[in-house]
């Protein structure tokens, strides 16, 4: 990723896949009821949404959804992303939030943004992101890492170019270079933090894995989606109703702008590394990053 944002190399296929997946997930949800649905009944004030954001939401016609990749062993979100759908401009944008970003939860707690899930589940995750970045998120989609494992295995694995430094950190791998990774190996790869630029390298690997998944999906027949999704739908939890899913799918399928822009928060030059009680944190400057994410999502 560039300093703040860049076009996805496979952006041209994302919107079609996005729409198809939502439709198929809806059908599977109705027929198998494997996907978990969790309604969030909290008012906007308890989700950290202020009056100014409610007005902006209506003016800009943007819907933001929090995507959580959850590590069940740590009971924390290993990855946090905000997907933004602009229904007027007809585009999607993806914002990645660094998991080590410092957020104060208490003197005796782990003060990282990904631990919002640990202390209060998806509701606190939504509230924390809203309050710290002045956003208007009401819904989420959560995927367990076992789900990612199953998705990739269902696709027959993905091809990645592995460095010699990465090989020892991926179970069952014997050589470096281009090769097909299994689901568990791809998860190992996406979670490497000790090679390269720590968490920055890790988010780059996660993006490469996602691009490969999208590439494989684009080459599949629509008739193959139900079998694939039924194998991992039990690992998905969301607060989005089936009616809302259909509405989003309908909107996305009509989008003319076929690229997805990406942003990483905090942006370069607005953060520093710091250790507190021997725990690593990413201290970041709020004003600059709120401005950056608003410029990115709302076009201000």
What are these regions (language model features)?
Residues 2-5, 11-12, 16-18, 22-300:
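Non-catalytic, solvent-exposed segments at the cell envelope interface
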């Amino acid at each position: 990723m560039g300093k703040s944002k860049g076009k996805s190399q496979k952006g041209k296929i994302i919107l079609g896949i996005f729409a198809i997946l939502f439709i198929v997930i809806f059908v599977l949800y109705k027929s198998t009821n494997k996907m978990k649905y969790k309604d969030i009944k909290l008012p906007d004030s308890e989700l950290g949404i202020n009056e100014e954001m409610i007005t902006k939401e209506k003016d800009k016609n943007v819907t933001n959804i929090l995507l959580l990749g959850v590590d069940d062993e740590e009971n924390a979100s290993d990855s946090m992303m905000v997907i933004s759908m602009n229904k007027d401009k007809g585009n999607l944008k993806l914002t990645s939030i660094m998991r080590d970003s410092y957020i104060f939860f208490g003197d005796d707690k782990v003060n990282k943004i990904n631990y919002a899930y640990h202390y209060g589940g998806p509701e606190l995750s939504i509230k924390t992101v809203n309050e710290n970045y002045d956003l208007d998120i009401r819904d989420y989609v959560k995927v367990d890492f076992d789900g990612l494992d199953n998705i990739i295995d269902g696709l027959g694995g993905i091809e990645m170019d592995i460095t010699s430094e990465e090989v020892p950190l991926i179970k069952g791998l014997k050589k470096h270079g281009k090769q097909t990774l299994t689901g568990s190996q791809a998860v190992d790869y996406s979670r490497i933090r000790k090679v390269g630029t720590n968490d920055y390298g890790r988010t780059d690997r996660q993006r490469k894995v996602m691009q490969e998944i999208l590439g494989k999906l684009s080459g599949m027949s629509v008739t193959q989606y139900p079998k694939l999704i039924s194998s991992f739908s039990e690992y998905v939890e969301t607060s989005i109703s089936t009616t809302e899913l259909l509405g989003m799918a309908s909107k996305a399928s009509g989008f003319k702008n076929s690229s997805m822009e990406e942003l990483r928060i905090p942006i370069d030059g607005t953060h520093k590394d710091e250790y507190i009680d021997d725990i690593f944190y990413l201290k970041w400057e709020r004003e600059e990053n709120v401005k950056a994410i608003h410029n990115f999502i709302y076009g201000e």
